[in-house]
Amino acid sequence: MKHGLPEAVCEKIRAVLSRYPQVEQAILYGSRAKGNYKNGSDIDLTLRGGADLTLNVIYRILDDLDELLLPYAVHLSILDHISDRDVIEHIQRVGVVFYEKPKP
């Protein structure tokens, strides 16, 4: 549990992500991926998917995650929409796959 999240929390988040066929992969980054998180650290996830992975989908996922009443803030982004080169390099360097859509 390098990222400091209980497995039950991870499974709840993965269950939400799995309900959205637009999400092909979720990558955990930030302090939780680096292992230098604090108890209340947020959960930074960037998502990979096709052209149908839009901000509207992100908002729906965030609404579903909010209903879980998790004791953590969850920040979602779409990897292909990130323009900050430093953030992209950080994700490439420390990011870990958190969820992957099952192959048919």
For each of these PLM feature ranges, what is it?
Residues 1-25, 34-39, 50-104:
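Catalytic core of pol beta-like nucleotidyltransferases
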